[in-house]
């Protein structure tokens, strides 16, 4: 009897390794979340006190969790743009076309969390700086 229970336990553990935890974060294709990164520019820049706006360079990592809605967690590499914060462009108007990346500008890594409940017309975005990124650092 113990042998059967042991075999059942081994199979349960091996099966659990190959499946995802219900309600847990699941890795997704980061390149598909570039638009979400650009939509988070106002929140990222509310945490930034530099002279110029920060803009996404690339999404380094993306994860999605389905609970009461969808929670998307991104790691976004951002860089200093050519647009001054005190200029005519507001953070909500920043795009790749009107605020290009500044050559040699400051770079940082941010964690962006986006919680959405479409049936309630609810969307909440939070951003927090993880760390600065050195100019020669590969990410």
UniProtKB/Swiss-Prot annotation:
Domain of life: Eukaryota
Record carries keyword Disulfide bond: yes
Alphabetically ordered keywords of this record: Disulfide bond, Glycoprotein, Protease inhibitor, Signal, Thiol protease inhibitor
SUPFAM superfamilies in the record: Cystatin/monellin
Single Gene Ontology MF annotation: cysteine-type endopeptidase inhibitor activity
Gene Ontology CC annotations of this record: cytoplasm; extracellular space; vesicle
One of the Pfam families matching this protein, by short name: Cystatin
Family: Belongs to the cystatin family.
Functional description taken from the UniProt entry: Cysteine protease inhibitor which inhibits members of the peptidase C1 family. Does not inhibit asparaginyl endopeptidase. May play a protective role against exogenous cysteine proteases derived from soil bacteria or fungi, or rotting fruits and vegetation.
Name of protein: Cystatin cpi-1
UniProt source species: Caenorhabditis elegans
